[in-house]
UniProtKB/Swiss-Prot annotation:
Bilayer topology term: Multi-pass membrane protein
Tagged with keyword Cell inner membrane: yes
Disulfide bond positions: none
UniProt catalytic activity: a ubiquinone + n Na(+)(in) + NADH + H(+) = a ubiquinol + n Na(+)(out) + NAD(+)
Annotated source species: Vibrio anguillarum
Physiological role: NQR complex catalyzes the reduction of ubiquinone-1 to ubiquinol by two successive reactions, coupled with the transport of Na(+) ions from the cytoplasm to the periplasm. NqrA to NqrE are probably involved in the second step, the conversion of ubisemiquinone to ubiquinol.
Places the protein is found: Cell inner membrane
Name of this protein: Na(+)-translocating NADH-quinone reductase subunit D
Highest classification ranks of the organism: Bacteria, Pseudomonadati, Pseudomonadota, Gammaproteobacteria, Vibrionales
Record-linked InterPro entries: NqrD, NqrDE/RnfAE
Alphabetical UniProt keywords: Cell inner membrane, Cell membrane, Ion transport, Membrane, NAD, Sodium, Sodium transport, Translocase, Transmembrane, Transmembrane helix, Transport, Ubiquinone
Length: 210
């Protein structure tokens, strides 16, 4: 059983120290597509966290019984099954959000973060640490998504979770929404600023000069 210190490290390290988007530059496509609203970013975070944690758990449980030649296929089958479960739950209980997320829920199957943790960690580790690692990397992914979604929705529409936060000019307020924040390039800019901020705060993440 992992100690409390190891569990804390596994959960918190992917948020800043080894963030899958900011440091490893993985899972960027969905970060651009689902962050126009904080609500969709939050749901996508939960979906990826669920899939990453349980795919790690199941891969770890059967890792000694998977032939090396088909390990990627087995991992993909497990991940795909979990994604189908998530997709069906969203369709049943959060249909409007499911429509907004569109194909990007299905594309979790090909998300490099999920595949990477299954191959690099779960195949070599015990079930509980693998499950915790999945939660941690899901949180790291979600940290970027939720931060980007927060600024895009707030500055792009003056709302958060669909509720008006900044009084809009059209309603007699003072804020004029910035339409650029609702376009995909704004997510690139925000992720770039986040990477800069994290690497300023964590200079050890800077790449060595050639």
């Amino acid at each position: 059983m992992s100690s409390a210190k190891e569990i804390k490290k596994s959960i918190l390290a992917p948020v800043l120290d080894n963030n899958p988007i900011a440091l490893q530059v993985l899972g960027v496509c969905s970060a651009l597509a689902v962050t126009t609203k904080l609500e969709t970013a939050f749901v996508m975070t939960l979906a990826v966290m669920f899939v990453t944690a349980f795919s790690n758990l199941f891969v770890s449980l059967i890792r000694h019984h998977i032939p090396n030649s088909v390990r990627i296929i087995v991992q993909m089958a497990i991940i795909a099954s979990l994604v189908i479960v998530v997709d069906q739950i969203l369709r049943a209980y959060l249909y409007d959000i499911s429509k907004q997320l569109s194909v990007f829920v299905g594309l979790i199957i090909t998300n490099c973060i999920v595949m990477g943790r299954a191959e690099a960690f779960a195949m070599k580790s015990a079930p509980i640490p693998s499950f915790i690692d999945g939660i941690g990397n899901g949180l790291g992914y979600g940290f970027v998504l939720i931060t980007v979604g927060f600024f895009r929705e707030l500055l792009g529409s003056g709302k958060l979770f669909g509720m008006e936060v900044l009084p809009l000019v059209k309603d007699g307020g003072w804020y004029q929404p910035n339409g650029l924040m609702l376009l995909a390039p704004s997510a690139f800019f925000l992720i770039g600023f986040m990477i800069w901020a994290i690497r300023t705060f964590k200079p050890e993440q800077l790449e060595a000069k050639e």
